[in-house]
């Protein structure tokens, strides 16, 4: 009976260690459904109902289309805007901390004691002592950061909300599957319509509350990540 219980417990433990589903292990990662990136991260402001404009009789111009006198810039919910990402950052930090502290204390005392009643007559005695305390603490710390980041991409995002002051809330995502590895690029933020160029493009550094994510998922990413048991052990290990 004990071998059966041991085998069952081992099987359950191995099943718990599995972080991916069978489909993911057999066929690799899958792409998210189209349109999932259009979901805004917060509740949008209700948009007023717009009555569709009717076409003028025997007119070659459709009033429902884009205006011939207006720049083709994103301005309404559902419009597409192009975001250019050109990051070339470099940071170097070098910190050094050294702290030392010493303390010493010396206390002496002397006292005369008179004892009587134990024997005939009286006896006298004396006591003396010396108490010394010393302490020494020191701290030495050093830290250095040297990092460089380069990222040059472009992404088409969709306007998911028009704020009361006219700013545009955008959200976009892009996924590419190559050799069972998915490259995922997501971007979200708030754009001022005045920063949109005539070709309907805005730079990433003009996007307020920008959230840019460039990551991946798949078999290669799973191998690079430590197992969840190791991460749990590192979280509770005090040493």
Curated annotation (Swiss-Prot):
Its main location: membrane. Belongs to the FlgH family. This is Flagellar L-ring protein. A lipid is attached at residue 17 (N-palmitoyl cysteine). InterPro entries: Flag_Lring. One of its GO terms (molecular function) is cytoskeletal motor activity. The basal body constitutes a major portion of the flagellar organelle and consists of four rings (L,P,S, and M) mounted on a central rod. It comes from the Bacteria. Assembles around the rod to form the L-ring and probably protects the motor/basal body from shearing forces during rotation. It is found in: Cell outer membrane; Bacterial flagellum basal body. Residues 120-145 are annotated as: Disordered. One of its GO terms (cellular component) is cell outer membrane. Residues 1-16 form the signal peptide. Residues 120-138 have a biased composition (Polar residues). Keywords: Bacterial flagellum, Cell outer membrane, Lipoprotein, Membrane, Palmitate, Signal. A lipid is attached at residue 17 (S-diacylglycerol cysteine). It is a lipid-anchor. GO terms for biological process: bacterial-type flagellum-dependent cell motility.
């Amino acid at each position: 009976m004990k071998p059966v219980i041991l085998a069952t417990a081992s099987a359950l433990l191995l099943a718990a260690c599995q972080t991916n589903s069978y489909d993911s292990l057999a066929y690799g990662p899958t792409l998210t459904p189209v349109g999932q990136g259009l979901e805004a991260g917060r509740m949008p402001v209700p948009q007023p109902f717009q009555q569709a404009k009717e076409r003028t009789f025997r007119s070659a111009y459709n009033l429902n289309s884009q205006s011939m006198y207006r720049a083709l810039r994103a301005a309404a919910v559902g419009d597409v805007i192009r975001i250019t990402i050109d990051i070339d950052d470099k940071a170097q930090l070098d910190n050094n901390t050294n702290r030392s502290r010493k303390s010493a204390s010396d206390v002496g005392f002397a006292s005369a004691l008179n004892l009587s009643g134990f024997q005939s007559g009286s006896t006298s005695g004396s006591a003396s002592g010396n108490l010394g305390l010393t302490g020494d603490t020191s701290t030495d710390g050093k830290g250095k950061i040297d990092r460089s980041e380069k990222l040059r991409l472009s992404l088409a995002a969709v306007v998911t909300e028009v704020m009361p002051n006219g700013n545009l809330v955008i959200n976009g995502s892009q996924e590419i599957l190559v050799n069972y590895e998915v490259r995922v690029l997501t971007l979200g933020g708030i754009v001022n319509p005045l920063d949109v160029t005539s070709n309907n493009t805005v730079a990433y550094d003009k996007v307020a509350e920008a959230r840019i994510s460039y990551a991946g998922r798949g078999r290669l990413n799973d191998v690079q990540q430590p197992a969840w048991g190791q991460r749990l052990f590192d979280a509770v290990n005090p040493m």
